[in-house]
Design a protein with these regions (language model features):
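ABC ATPase nucleotide-binding domain signature region
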Residues: 69-132
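Extended helical coiled-coil dimerization/tether regions that scaffold
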Residues: 2-17, 115-189
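H-loop/switch region of ABC-family ATPase nucleotide-binding domains
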Residues: 248-250
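Conserved ABC ATPase signature
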Residues: 50-54, 172-201, 218-222
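GG-anchored amphipathic helix commonly corresponding to the ABC/SMC/Rad50 NBD signature/C-loop
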Residues: 67, 190-215, 228
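A conserved segment at the C-terminal end of the G1
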Residues: 62-69
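Pre-Walker A-like glycine/lysine-rich segment at the N-terminus of P-loop NTPase domains
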Residues: 14-61
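RecA-like P-loop NTPase motor core
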Residues: 256-326
Length: 326
């Protein structure tokens, strides 16, 4: 997939007309352990929640899912009556949010569950007997895209959608690949990152169009290289299929891809509770994650007096610039 097509995907995520179902606001009131002023506002097809471990990112995602879905499949510690969600459809407020289609995904958890189930099964061939591999996902273009994401060349990839084997209402992909030298193997022999990337690729194409997708810690087991290409692909499919994505992440690569404008910083102070802010400068969320932002450049001055003058002026008028440059 060409880089220009990737970049167009990111541009299109900014065009809200591409999304029929938009998660625009989440407010939480009078909930124990949550700030009284908690209000998460979103205005892009892909947004990211960032913050240190244990501050409440997963709690927020699970609360959103449970509030819309109301099926009890995802454990949630907040009282749903304290949560107010605003969805928009074609620029109009959705009156019954329970009609929206929402999916919650912890990729590493799902993949581990699937592989563990397959390893414990006596005859795996029984699961895929009579099932034809997906013609769409097995196209040459998609094989090339998956290869770019993972950093490996494949000559053939087969996705078998197995339904009702692991659970009554559960579908997962059993995947077989062939390399250019003729070597064949399945998801049981894949590295965790390889199967995880293919699983996310399958999932984003399997779920309904014009739905909401909540992804918790997408970067687990995935290399920095693959994170970059995977996010580009998600942006492309998100804008093409109208899938509104909110994810949580600690990854500098993913935060940089999504951009500071679409990042929301989650914190949890003992006397305040879970809070959310929209950082205006990248150093605020990088520092909150324990990541030291790279300097953008260097100012060269003539002498110490010039250095002191410039430093004082920047600290007074533009502290962010002073922080960004040596």
């Amino acid at each position: 997939m060409r880089q220009a097509k990737f970049n167009d995907g990111w541009r299109r995520t900014q065009e809200l007309s591409n999304y029929n179902c938009q998660l625009r606001q989440v407010s939480i009131n009078d909930a124990k352990g949550v700030s009284d002023k908690f209000c998460l506002e979103l205005d892009n097809g892909i947004s990211v929640l960032c913050g240190k471990n244990g501050v409440g990112k997963s709690t927020i995602l699970k609360s959103i899912y449970s509030c819309i879905k109301k099926n009890g499949l995802v454990n949630n510690r907040l009282n749903l009556s304290d949560i107010n969600i605003s969805l928009k459809n074609n620029n109009h407020e959705v009156q019954d949010i329970n009609n929206a289609v929402v999916n919650y995904l912890e990729p590493s958890v799902e993949c581990n569950k699937i592989i563990r189930f397959l390893n414990d099964s006596d005859n795996i061939n029984d699961f895929i007997e009579g099932i034809e591999p997906s013609g769409f996902l097995g196209k040459k273009e998609n094989i090339a895209i998956i290869g770019n994401i993972i950093g490996r060349v494949y000559s053939k990839i087969e996705f078998y959608e197995v339904e009702g084997a692991l659970d009554d209402d559960y579908t997962f992909p059993f995947i077989k690949v062939t390399l250019p030298d003729g070597v064949e193997y399945s998801c049981l022999e894949m590295g965790s990152g390889e199967y995880l990337c293919m699983y996310i690729f399958w999932f984003i194409n399997w779920i309904e169009k014009n739905s909401i997708l909540l992804i918790d810690e997408i970067e687990n087991c995935i290399s920095v290289y693959s994170q970059e290409y995977l996010m580009d692909y998600l942006a492309h499919v998100s804008s093409q299929r109208g899938i509104w994505i909110l994810l949580s992440s600690h990854s500098e690569t993913i935060l940089s891809k999504v951009g500071i404008k679409n990042a929301r910083l989650i914190s949890n102070v003992s006397n305040v509770g879970i809070s959310v802010v929209s950082p205006k400068h990248e150093r605020k969320y990088f520092t909150a994650l324990g990541i030291k932002p790279r300097k953008k450049g260097i100012f060269i001055v003539e002498d110490k007096f010039s250095y002191m003058f410039l430093k004082g002026m920047l600290n007074r008028a533009a502290s962010d610039i002073a922080y960004d440059y040596h």
